[in-house]
């Protein structure tokens, strides 16, 4: 049995214009010196799916347009706002001054599982 690819309209995916106008979740993802272009594209795609406010790309993290990012982002670089910072610290300072709470995500010993965080709808992260 051959499987049919579902269209954007069947997925109820917003057009780029609709996405720009949509209410976003007050979350900004900061990518700190991420090397993998494919992972960067995947994060754009995930941010698009969850209506994330923006992505901040820092240091050596590649920026769109880039063919490897585009390949995995599947159009999300056209919808999700992004900004480049030479230094991650500058991005963090901007977010703190705008009232965001900063969380670092890393797989390390004694880390808190993301599903255990106590975050309410009004929290800007």
Show which residues each predicted segment covers:
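Post-transcriptional modification and biogenesis factors for structured RNAs
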Residues: 1-125
């Amino acid at each position: 049995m051959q499987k049919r690819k579902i269209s954007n309209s069947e997925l109820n995916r917003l057009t780029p214009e609709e996405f720009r106008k949509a209410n976003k979740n007050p979350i900004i993802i900061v990518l700190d010196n991420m090397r993998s272009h494919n992972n960067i594209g995947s994060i754009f795609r995930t941010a698009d799916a969850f209506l994330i406010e923006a992505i901040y790309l820092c240091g050596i993290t590649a920026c769109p347009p880039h063919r490897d990012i585009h390949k995995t982002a599947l159009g999300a670089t056209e919808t999700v706002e992004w900004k480049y910072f030479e230094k991650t610290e500058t991005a963090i300072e901007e977010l703190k001054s705008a009232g965001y709470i900063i969380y670092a995500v890393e797989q390390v010993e004694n880390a808190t599982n993301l599903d255990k965080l106590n975050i309410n709808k009004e929290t800007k992260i």
